[in-house]
Amino acid sequence: MEPPGEKPGEAEALSITPQLLKSHSGEFALDSILLLKLRGLGVVDLGCLGECLNLEWLDLSGNALTHLGPLASLRQLAVLNVSNNRLTGLEPLAACENLQSLNAAGNLLTTPGQLQCLAGLQALEHLRLRDPLARLSNPLCANASYWAVVRELLPGLKVIDGERVSGRGSELYQLCRDLDSSLRSGSSPGPRAIEAQPWVEPGYWESWPIRSSSILEEACRQFQDTLQECLDLDRQASDSLAQAQQALSPAETTSSFVF
């Protein structure tokens, strides 16, 4: 991705105010805000955002931020998305001791050294500097070895750019990366590749004739048995009703002569 420039349809540049925070969170007090989504508002100044002392989840993606100063006071912040901005540094985040997940893809971070400020964050496990699906990156990602440098700089990370680098499942991601590397290094002009062939034979996906199964037959048999039981019960009920009517008939005839 090219460094982020003017964002299409960017709203008028604005600074974060108490009124804006309250209207987007529905809270009356800034220190009551736990979750805040301020995506794509054209924010250039974080203003009073640092007063949201209990904020835990914050989305500032798609704005025009160049610094994160006020975030230094957000000690409870656990998840932060500042992707697609114009950041050249992340130093204020060094004070966010509870930060667990950071998305900084699509900014102007040029060297791994700019991530040194995150080294003291013991809780940080997820870091994204590049997002291929959203076509967001940072200049430092142009170096093919940036992954290794970031892992050495931040050994506590478990996920980088959405791929697990340690813990359960990391071996599979490493295998895929090694395979990609070998394919890239082995690519050279040579004999024409064999034309791809279908995976299955013609007609494989055609539907097969419906076959009766023992399960279906057993289900039909049980249904027929149940239906027969219902018919027997209905017959018994009809007989009982007829007998009851016959037993009551003399009484009704006698009572008709009483004045």
From Swiss-Prot:
Domain LRRCT: 138-178
LRR repeat residues: 54-75, 76-97, 98-119
Signal peptide as annotated in the record: none
Transmembrane stretches, start-end: none
Gene3D superfamilies for this protein: Ribonuclease Inhibitor
Repeat in keyword set: yes
Keywords: Leucine-rich repeat, Repeat
Record-given protein name: Leucine-rich repeat-containing protein 61
Source organism of this protein record: Mus musculus
